[in-house]
């Protein structure tokens, strides 16, 4: 949190490691404060557990989230206000 305060905006944010619903949502919400209209989030292990699936659903439904791509092992989120809200799922 302290390091985020030193950053004006986040262009790319990779979130990995904790695998807990509450923590993942917390990290997303904290980083969301520093986004711009071209920010991309990447979340690892979105199906690691039921909690991570819940966190992924929360992230997809956030009003600032405009486009998501579910690659099963990871999720990509675009924050771009002029895009239509879309959720894609690609398995490969």
Role assignments for model-derived ranges:
Residues 1-12, 22:
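S-adenosyl-L-methionine
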Residues 12-14, 42:
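Structural motif
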Residues 16-19:
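Switch II (G3) loop of P-loop NTPases
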Residues 22-92:
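C-terminal substrate-binding/active-site "lid" region of AdoMet-derived donor-dependent transferases
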């Amino acid at each position: 949190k302290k390091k985020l305060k030193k950053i004006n905006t986040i262009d790319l944010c990779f979130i990995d490691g904790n695998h807990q619903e509450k923590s993942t949502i917390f990290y997303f919400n904290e980083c969301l404060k520093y986004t711009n209209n071209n920010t991309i989030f990447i979340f690892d292990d979105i199906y690691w557990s039921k909690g991570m699936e819940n966190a992924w659903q929360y992230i997809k439904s956030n009003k600032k989230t405009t486009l998501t791509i579910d690659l099963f092992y990871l999720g990509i989120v675009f924050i771009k206000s002029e895009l239509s809200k879309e959720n894609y799922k690609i398995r490969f």
